[in-house]
Amino acid sequence: GLENHTWLYFAVFTGVIVGLILEPVPGAVVAMVGISIIAILSPWLLFSPEQLAQPGFKFTAKSLSWAVSGFSNSVIWLIFAAFMFGTGYEKTGLGRRIALFLVKKMGHRTLFLGYAVMFSELILAPVTPSNSARGAGIIYPIIRNLPPLYQSQPNDSSSRSIGSYIMWMGIVADCVTSAIFLTAMAPNLLLIGLMKSASHATLSWGDWFLGMLPLSILLVLLVPWLAYVLYPPVLKSGDQVPRWAETELQAMGPLCSREKRMLGLMVGALV
């Protein structure tokens, strides 16, 4: 069976998991409290009696080294950097501008509007490692305004006019693009870390992208069309969506300096 200190460690670990699920405080606070408890009580939670009895064993230094070991993990820093880019996309309005531009150019036909949603996700995905933030925070606030332009309402027969197709594409495009890029979703990065610790094999951003490229091309090109065929919208074309997108872009004004800097940082990071 497990040793006593391992069981105590497991108890604290379980408490952290429960805290992350229930979220009485933000998740970062729960994690820091858990790390602090284990580091402070390390003689009873982290190390066995045999380790503590070794000559020259300094549990204080070992505890501190364990507590900050995550900061030396390159995967953690990659996740952090990608989240910062995602926040920048949202705060500067660059993500919204890109999506509106594609909707304006491709929104005359419902099928092309589906491709606009897919391409918007495709552009945002490499630097937004949260599919929830990308889909719900950037894409959804835009596409939810499109169906009412054609009197297509949820929970109503009019939803099949265009709304159902657009919302379905929002969900599917989010899922597809999350698998294409290593930095499109945080679990992808964690998976690389687990793979490295288990098999000592490494997989770079380029390796992931090239491995997914053949399937990615098929998914990006076929999914909007398949959804259009299998779940066809009643409305096939219209001019209201492009006009609305153009109005929104005019309200945003020209590309500001913050957006230009964000775009430059994004291109530089990807290169």
PLM regions with names:
Residues G1-A11, S72-A81:
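Structural signature of hydrophobic alpha-helical transmembrane segments
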Residues G1-H5, L102-L111, N155-S161, A251-S257:
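Short, amphipathic, aromatic/basic-enriched membrane-interface segments that mark the entry/exit
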Residues L2-E3, L46, T60-S69, L190-D207, ...:
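Transmembrane helix-loop junctions at the membrane interface of multipass transporters and ion channels
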Residues A11-V18, V117-I123, G170-A173, L265-L270:
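Hydrophobic, membrane-inserted alpha-helices
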Residues V29-N155:
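Membrane-embedded alpha-helical segments and adjacent helix-loop junctions characteristic
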Residues K91, N131-R134, Y150-G264:
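Juxtamembrane and boundary regions of transmembrane helices in multi-pass small-molecule transporters
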